[in-house]
């Protein structure tokens, strides 16, 4: 079954421009992490455009979602529990008794209520030693189920910058490291969670996990992602398990991004110490679609850089370089899964597509019609063709610039293919909150 897309409506207007800018920024940040050849310096991605030609979509199968899509991480566990699992707590007093409704602006109402609950008519007094200390805000009862978890600050997501988009990708869950222990582990009784010191002996202490649900010390560190948005548990180059770069990026519950979760892994930590994978409950309304995606359009991407000349001395002068990707040809199987207000998206490699859908997927004629086990098929990339134009130097005083520099073009195309396959091809996937 084919699907028609209103491409102009989806890619134009303020929303389309914002999405294009986020994609440009994502690709730019990825290029900043690349080790450049000695003769290239300062790569900048200056523009991105969706073009005017839409992709062709054809639904091939409908099935249950991949198990990786059900895996939770500690960052999204808090929001999940606040949305669906945590019932609203009844207000309680400091002794754990249920508090009846009372008017806060009525003089003496709280004191009268407490006297009635405790069964005496004398004036209400605090226990000895607490008259002047008061109740610590961190120890007072807090209904975290009513707090929007996205109001807490988060670190910048290594894809779409700013942390405000509706895109996210995830990194694979791995081991724990020192103080960067995930919140879920602390709540289960980690030996590192000593709790708050009890300055009031009569009051039971609360652990850090109860009062700092999203602090910098309780969340897994994302510093090693290069501080760059959109995951999947983006398993771009790590353990082939769900992450998630979905973890593009705070706002409302709709259109919210989940940050990537990639805790640092200790090389000497035994595998038995790794936390077990926590899976969401499968529901009957969850579904997954395999969709063949073919594209031969005029999508464009512009980059600038400098080429260094070593004559008469190393890095003697830099020449401006401009690269324009003017279109590409693409043929792959997309996976779209819907699981409780989350849409997970990725592409399948040619080998996985052959195994799940059949060898006819991705065969567009010519060399692509080889048998699945043919050695010539293995290196096949999802990006079949990328058209690029390059220009070195500036046209000044009638002088012509040097165009179509093959060595530089080859390097840029290799990096574009690598970024695409690491960030978009399963087991990497992106998560959208809807």
Swiss-Prot record:
<keyword id="KW-0813">Transport</keyword>
<feature type="domain" description="SMP-LTD">
    <location>
        <begin position="1"/>
        <end position="434"/>
    </location>
</feature>
<dbReference type="GO" id="GO:0008289">
    <property type="term" value="F:lipid binding"/>
</dbReference>
<dbReference type="GO" id="GO:1990456">
    <property type="term" value="P:mitochondrion-endoplasmic reticulum membrane tethering"/>
</dbReference>
<dbReference type="InterPro" id="IPR027532">
    <property type="entry name" value="Mdm12"/>
</dbReference>
<dbReference type="Pfam" id="PF10296">
    <property type="entry name" value="MMM1"/>
</dbReference>
<keyword id="KW-1000">Mitochondrion outer membrane</keyword>
<keyword id="KW-0445">Lipid transport</keyword>
<keyword id="KW-0446">Lipid-binding</keyword>
<protein>
    <recommendedName>
        <fullName>Mitochondrial distribution and morphology protein 12</fullName>
    </recommendedName>
</protein>
<dbReference type="GO" id="GO:0005789">
    <property type="term" value="C:endoplasmic reticulum membrane"/>
</dbReference>
<dbReference type="GO" id="GO:0045040">
    <property type="term" value="P:protein insertion into mitochondrial outer membrane"/>
</dbReference>
<keyword id="KW-0472">Membrane</keyword>
<dbReference type="InterPro" id="IPR031468">
    <property type="entry name" value="SMP_LBD"/>
</dbReference>
<feature type="region of interest" description="Disordered">
    <location>
        <begin position="181"/>
        <end position="275"/>
    </location>
</feature>
<keyword id="KW-0256">Endoplasmic reticulum</keyword>
<comment type="function">
    <text>Component of the ERMES/MDM complex, which serves as a molecular tether to connect the endoplasmic reticulum (ER) and mitochondria. Components of this complex are involved in the control of mitochondrial shape and protein biogenesis, and function in nonvesicular lipid trafficking between the ER and mitochondria. MDM12 is required for the interaction of the ER-resident membrane protein MMM1 and the outer mitochondrial membrane-resident beta-barrel protein MDM10.</text>
</comment>
<comment type="similarity">
    <text>Belongs to the MDM12 family.</text>
</comment>
<dbReference type="InterPro" id="IPR019411">
    <property type="entry name" value="MMM1_dom"/>
</dbReference>
<comment type="subunit">
    <text>Component of the ER-mitochondria encounter structure (ERMES) or MDM complex, composed of MMM1, MDM10, MDM12 and MDM34. A MMM1 homodimer associates with one molecule of MDM12 on each side in a pairwise head-to-tail manner, and the SMP-LTD domains of MMM1 and MDM12 generate a continuous hydrophobic tunnel for phospholipid trafficking.</text>
</comment>
<feature type="compositionally biased region" description="Basic and acidic residues">
    <location>
        <begin position="86"/>
        <end position="97"/>
    </location>
</feature>
<feature type="compositionally biased region" description="Acidic residues">
    <location>
        <begin position="70"/>
        <end position="83"/>
    </location>
</feature>
<feature type="region of interest" description="Disordered">
    <location>
        <begin position="70"/>
        <end position="141"/>
    </location>
</feature>
<dbReference type="GO" id="GO:0015914">
    <property type="term" value="P:phospholipid transport"/>
</dbReference>
<keyword id="KW-0496">Mitochondrion</keyword>
<dbReference type="GO" id="GO:0032865">
    <property type="term" value="C:ERMES complex"/>
</dbReference>
<dbReference type="GO" id="GO:0000002">
    <property type="term" value="P:mitochondrial genome maintenance"/>
</dbReference>
<feature type="compositionally biased region" description="Polar residues">
    <location>
        <begin position="215"/>
        <end position="237"/>
    </location>
</feature>
């Amino acid at each position: 079954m084919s699907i028609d897309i209103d491409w102009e409506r989806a890619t134009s207007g303020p929303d389309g421009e914002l999405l294009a800018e986020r994609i440009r920024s994502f690709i730019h940040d990825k290029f900043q992490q690349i080790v450049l050849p000695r003769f290239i310096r300062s790569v900048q991605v200056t523009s991105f455009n969706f073009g005017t030609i839409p992709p062709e979509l054809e639904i091939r199968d409908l099935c249950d979602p991949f198990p990786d899509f059900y895996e939770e991480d500690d960052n999204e566990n808090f929001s999940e529990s606040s949305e669906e699992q945590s019932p609203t707590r009844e207000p309680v007093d400091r002794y754990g008794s249920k508090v009846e409704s009372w008017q806060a602006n009525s003089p003496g109402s709280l004191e009268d209520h407490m006297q009635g609950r405790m069964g005496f008519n004398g004036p209400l007094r605090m226990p000895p030693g607490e008259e002047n200390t008061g109740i610590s805000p961190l120890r007072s009862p807090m209904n975290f189920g009513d707090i929007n978890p996205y109001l807490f600050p988060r670190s910048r997501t290594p894809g779409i910058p700013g942390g405000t988009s509706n895109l996210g990708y995830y990194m694979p869950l791995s081991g724990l490291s020192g103080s960067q222990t995930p919140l879920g582990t602390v709540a289960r009784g980690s030996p590192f969670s000593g709790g708050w010191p009890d300055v009031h002996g009569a009051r039971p202490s609360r652990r850090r996990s109860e009062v700092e649900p999203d602090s910098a010390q309780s969340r897994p560190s994302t510093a090693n992602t290069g501080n760059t948005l959109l995951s999947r548990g983006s398993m771009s180059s790590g353990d082939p398990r769900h992450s998630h770069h979905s973890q593009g990026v705070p706002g409302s519950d709709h259109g919210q991004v989940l940050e990537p979760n990639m805790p640092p892994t200790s090389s000497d930590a035994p595998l038995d110490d790794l936390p077990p994978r926590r899976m969401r409950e499968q529901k009957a309304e969850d579904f997954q679609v395999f969709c063949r995606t073919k594209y031969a359009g005029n999508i464009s991407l512009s980059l600038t850089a400098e080429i260094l000349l070593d004559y008469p001395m190393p890095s003697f002068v830099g020449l401006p370089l401009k690269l324009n990707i003017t279109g590409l040809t693409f043929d792959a199987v997309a996976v779209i899964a819907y699981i409780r207000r989350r849409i997970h998206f990725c592409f399948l490699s040619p080998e996985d597509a052959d195994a799940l859908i059949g060898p006819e997927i991705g065969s567009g004629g010519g060399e692509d019609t080889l048998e699945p086990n043919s050695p010539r098929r293995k290196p096949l990339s999802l990006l079949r063709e990328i058209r690029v134009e390059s220009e070195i130097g500036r046209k000044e005083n009638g002088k012509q610039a040097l165009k179509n520099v093959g060595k530089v073009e080859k390097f840029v195309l290799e990096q574009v293919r690598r970024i695409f396959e690491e960030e978009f091809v399963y087991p990497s996937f992106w998560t959208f909150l809807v």
